[in-house]
């Protein structure tokens, strides 16, 4: 089992790579985790009783502060389990003050198009790195993969003829993820140039490309596409995948399966994105709305006659 200090460093590196966390954000996570460790002992080995004592220690803090500290720990333990550094997750012992969840950051359709147009222009050179980058973003936005899932994909996860990937997500749970025709073409182009005996689809000298490198490549692509690099990250492209699918009419349960969420409540945060469309849909399609519109039309005609 990893020592807490090393595990914290790995966790912070993941936040920077997958979520584009700024230096101040990373410093806040570090303070929360190290503060919790001072109260509960070694976080990497801490059990539920030790974590339950944190609730008492935080009793004088504002609910928002408690929620932030508890969230940092839940994410930390989720990361440890995800990376195989720990088998159990003791974070259920942490307090859960009632707080509204922040809305996920995303990109507009036009911003995604600009990002892809730039990547496609660069891939036309048939040079390996631009072709690889196009394949990466096709899978991020086209299949909604987590950064960790994407960079660690084995070659065996990509069947030649079936339009699906076999992805191992959080907790070692496998799921089937559909791959678009565009993504398959990009993958085929990359496989033709890959030139490696590595078992990984996106190999590096040691194993596979890292989340940090994927994060850097997306930032660099955003700059070349004349987009704000602060708005672009693997995490944001995954959110864009979910947001745009929901806008297009995808069922929330289907979206839950595609994203690999264990709990539908995690997926429900995306329902905010389509509120305007849903209101318009009810106003236009609901039988009573149509009836009310008919009455308004009749009243308008009577006023005209008068």
Swiss-Prot record:
The keyword Phosphoprotein does not apply. Site-specific tyrosine recombinase, which acts by catalyzing the cutting and rejoining of the recombining DNA molecules. The XerC-XerD complex is essential to convert dimers of the bacterial chromosome into monomers to permit their segregation at cell division. It also contributes to the segregational stability of plasmids. PROSITE patterns: CB, TYR_RECOMBINASE. This is Tyrosine recombinase XerC. Keywords: Cell cycle, Cell division, Chromosome partition, Cytoplasm, DNA integration, DNA recombination, DNA-binding. Residues 2-81 form the Core-binding (CB) domain. It is found in: Cytoplasm. Gene3D superfamilies: 1.10.150.130, Intergrase catalytic core. Belongs to the 'phage' integrase family. XerC subfamily. GO terms for biological process: cell division; chromosome segregation; DNA transposition. It holds the Pfam family Phage_int_SAM_1. Forms a cyclic heterotetrameric complex composed of two molecules of XerC and two molecules of XerD. The active site is at 146, 170, 235, 238, 261, 270 (o-(3'-phospho-dna)-tyrosine intermediate). One of its GO terms (cellular component) is cytoplasm. One of its GO terms (molecular function) is DNA binding. The lineage of its organism: Bacteria, Pseudomonadati, Pseudomonadota, Alphaproteobacteria, Sphingomonadales. Residues 102-283 form the Tyr recombinase domain. Its main location: cytoplasm.
């Amino acid at each position: 089992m990893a020592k807490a200090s090393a595990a914290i460093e790995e966790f912070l590196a993941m936040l920077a790579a997958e979520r584009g966390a700024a230096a101040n954000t990373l410093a806040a996570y570090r303070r929360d985790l190290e503060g919790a460790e001072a109260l509960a002992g070694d976080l990497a080995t801490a059990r539920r009783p030790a974590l339950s004592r944190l609730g008492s220690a935080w009793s004088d803090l504002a609910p928002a502060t408690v929620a932030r500290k508890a969230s940092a720990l839940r994410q930390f333990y989720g990361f440890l389990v995800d990376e195989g550094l720990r088998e159990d997750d003791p974070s259920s012992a942490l307090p859960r003050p009632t707080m509204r969840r922040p809305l996920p950051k995303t990109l507009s359709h036009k911003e995604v198009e600009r990002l892809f147009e730039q990547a496609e222009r660069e891939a036309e050179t048939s040079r390996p790195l631009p072709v690889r980058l196009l394949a990466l973003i096709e899978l991020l936005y086209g299949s909604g993969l987590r950064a960790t899932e994407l960079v660690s994909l084995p070659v065996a996860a990509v069947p030649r003829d079936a339009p699906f990937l076999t992805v191992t997500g959080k907790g070692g749970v496998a799921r089937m993820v559909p791959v678009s025709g565009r993504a398959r073409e990009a993958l085929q182009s990359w496989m033709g140039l890959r030139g490696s005996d590595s078992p990984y689809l996106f190999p590096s000298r040691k194993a596979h490309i890292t989340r940090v490198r994927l994060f850097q490549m997306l930032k660099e692509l955003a700059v070349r596409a004349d987009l704000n690099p602060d708005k672009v990250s693997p995490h944001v492209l995954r959110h864009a995948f979910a947001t745009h699918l929901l806008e297009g009419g995808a069922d929330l349960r289907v979206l839950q399966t595609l994203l690999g969420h264990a709990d539908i409540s995690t997926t429900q945060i995306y329902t905010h994105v389509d509120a305007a469309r849903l209101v318009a849909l009810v106003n236009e399609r609901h039988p009573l709305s149509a009836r009310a519109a008919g009455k308004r039309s009749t009243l308008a005609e009577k006023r005209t006659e008068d």
